[in-house]
Amino acid sequence: MLKKIIILFLGMFLLSACTDNFRSYFQRSANNRLVDSKGAKGGKRKPVYNNKYITLAKKNIVEDNLDDDNDDDDDYDSDSPLRGERIDPVKRNRDMYLKMIKRDIARQKAESGFAESDDDMTLNRANKKVRKDDSDKEKRMQEELNQIKAMLRETKRDISKYTCPNATVNQNYAPPVTNYEPVNYPPVKNSKPYNNNSKVKQKFIREDDDNGSNACSI
C-alpha cells in the first residue's frame, strides 16, 4: 500500500511538471516564505515590497521632499494609443503614497477610538479648549493668592510677638503699690573723688546706651 502511494505521488509530480503554473507554487510570497497561506489574496500574490522604502517614501510625501525626474523619455508609452499624452510617474506615485498615508491615519484613528473627522474641529471645540485653559489659569492664580494671604497673616502674627511694649501707652495703667518703708542708708565715705572720665565708666555707659536703643528691635 505504501508503494502505491509513493508511485501515485511521483506520477502526480511528473504530470504537474508539464504545466506552466507549477513553477509558481515554489515562488516566495510577499512575506518571504515558501509556503504562505496568507500571502495570496484573491488568487494573486502581493509584490515583494520593502517596508523601509515605503516608510521613507511616505515621509518624503508628507514633508514635500520630492526629487522630480527631468528625463522625459519614460514619460511616453510607445504601445499606448494615446502616445502623445504625457504620463507623470512622479504624480502617480505621489497619489499612491497619499492614499496609503490616508489609510494609515484612518486606521490609527480607529485603533485609538477617535471617530471624529478633521472637519469636526469646529469653532465650538476651540472655544471649549480656550475656556478650559482660562479656568485652569484662574484656579492657579487663586491658589497663589491664597498662599500669599496666608504668608502675610503669619508674618503679621510673628511681628506682633516682638512688638516693643512701650510702643503703645495704656491709659488705664497704674503703678503697683508697695508697702515697703524707705530705708535711709548712711552715705558712703569715699576718701578719693569719683572720676567721671573713667574708661570703665564710659564703657558701661556705651553698653547701656546700646541696650536701650535695641530694646524695641525685632
UniProtKB/Swiss-Prot annotation:
It is found in: Cell membrane. Residues 132-164 form a coiled coil. A lipid is attached at residue 18 (N-palmitoyl cysteine). Its main location: membrane. GO terms for cellular component: plasma membrane. Residues 1-17 form the signal peptide. Residues 65-78 have a biased composition (Acidic residues). Keywords: Cell membrane, Coiled coil, Lipoprotein, Membrane, Palmitate, Signal. It comes from the Bacteria. Residues 65-88 are annotated as: Disordered. A lipid is attached at residue 18 (S-diacylglycerol cysteine). It is a lipid-anchor. This is Uncharacterized lipoprotein RF_0637. The lineage of its organism: Bacteria, Pseudomonadati, Pseudomonadota, Alphaproteobacteria, Rickettsiales.
